[in-house]
């Protein structure tokens, strides 16, 4: 699952991951993740800076909830300086934009295979 308010990012990552064989779901509104009840993704790519919501707050919430705490979360941001705060929020990993697809795939494979 990809959550990013930039449609270009959603499309680009979605196309690349589908090409690699992943089933991809996405949302431009990170707040919708707060109401996940039935279908949980194998991994969540979550932008930190989205309109009206901070991805770190979503991450904290999901990591506190019993039903979602085991979902690996990779927080993504254009600011490399906030990696520490991303990890403090409970993220399993961090990726700085712009990134290489190989770096993204390595993080996805590491977390999906270990979960």
Language-model segments: which ranges?
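Active-site residues of response regulator receiver
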Residues: 4, 47
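Two-component/phosphorelay signaling modules centered on CheY-like receiver
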Residues: 7-25, 111
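The feature encodes the CheY-like receiver
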Residues: 10, 51-52, 97
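Acidic, metal-coordinating helix/loop segments flanking the phosphotransfer/catalytic sites
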Residues: 26-43
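Hydrophobic/aromatic residues positioned on beta-strands within the core alpha/beta folds
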Residues: 74-76
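Short, glycine/charged-rich "phosphate-handling" switch motifs in NTP-dependent
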Residues: 92
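C-terminal output helix
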Residues: 99-112
């Amino acid at each position: 699952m990809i959550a990013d308010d930039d449609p270009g990012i959603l499309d680009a990552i979605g196309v690349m991951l589908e090409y690699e064989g992943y089933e991809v779901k996405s949302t431009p509104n990170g707040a919708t993740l707060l109401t996940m009840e039935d279908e949980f993704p194998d991994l969540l790519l979550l932008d930190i800076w989205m309109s009206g919501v901070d991805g770190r707050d979503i991450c904290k919430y999901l990591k506190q909830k019993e039903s979602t705490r085991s979902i690996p979360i990779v927080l993504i941001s254009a600011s490399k300086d906030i990696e520490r705060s991303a990890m403090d929020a409970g993220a399993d990993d961090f990726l700085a934009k712009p990134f290489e697809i190989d770096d993204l795939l390595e993080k996805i494979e590491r977390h999906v295979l270990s979960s």
